[in-house]
């Protein structure tokens, strides 16, 4: 059970790093690739067909900016879940990539997460939640992660209250 992480350009690696680090921290196997929907469309189609026919990947995370068609192209060749990270670029920030991701025609869904670096982490957590549906140990790791997040916020609030009470 694994995740394919595909970026449209190697320059997206810094943003995708959050996804890779999160997958590693949960012990989820992944493969990372650079494949462009526009510059290497044949390779994009071939990779998506590999994802569809093989059992290696259950979820695909992709990151692309501008005319972010990578997720849609991959989704057109596989029924596996596609999670897309909108990559900010000039002059529109992440608005253009977000719209390209969410404006898919009926029948070819692509999920979108937060734009930018937070999107990398959220994409991985979303992929992990999908994998956890059939992996009880991974589901427990995800519950532990959420508990730790809650505890950190409660501790931060207690610290703030203590500081403000002075």
What is each model feature region?
Residues 1-39:
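Glycine-rich phosphate/diphosphate-binding loop of Rossmann-like nucleotide-binding domains
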Residues 2, 7-14, 18, 95-166:
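C-terminal binding/interaction regions
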Residues 2-7, 31-33, 60-62, 83, ...:
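Short glycine-rich or small-residue beta-strand-to-loop segments that form or flank ligand, phosphate
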Residues 10, 35-37, 65-66, 87-90, ...:
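Short, ordered loop/turn segments at secondary-structure junctions
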Residues 12-16, 41-44, 64-73, 92-95, ...:
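Short glycine/serine/threonine-rich phosphate/pyrophosphate-binding segments
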Residues 19-25, 77-79, 128-129:
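Short, solvent-exposed amphipathic alpha-helical segments in soluble enzyme
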Residues 32-52:
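N-terminal beta-loop-helix "entrance" segment that forms/cooperates
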Residues 47-86, 90:
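Glycine-rich phosphate-binding loop
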């Amino acid at each position: 059970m694994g995740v394919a992480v595909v970026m449209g350009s190697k320059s997206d690696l810094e943003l995708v790093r959050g996804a890779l680090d999160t997958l590693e921290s949960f012990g989820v196997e992944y493969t990372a690739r650079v494949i462009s929907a526009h510059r290497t469309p044949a390779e994009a189609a071939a990779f998506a067909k590999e994802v569809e026919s093989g059992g290696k990947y259950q979820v695909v995370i992709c990151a692309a900016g501008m005319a972010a068609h990578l997720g849609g192209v991959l989704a057109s060749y596989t029924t596996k879940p596609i999670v897309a990270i909108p990559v900010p670029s000039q002059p529109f920030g992440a608005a253009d990539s977000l719209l390209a991701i969410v404006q898919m025609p009926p029948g070819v869904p692509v999920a979108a997460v937060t734009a930018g670096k937070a999107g990398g982490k959220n994409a991985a957590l979303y992929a992990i939640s999908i994998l956890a549906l059939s992996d009880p140990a991974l589901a427990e790791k995800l519950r532990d992660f959420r508990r730790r997040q809650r505890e950190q916020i409660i501790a931060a609030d207690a610290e703030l209250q203590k500081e403000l009470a002075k």
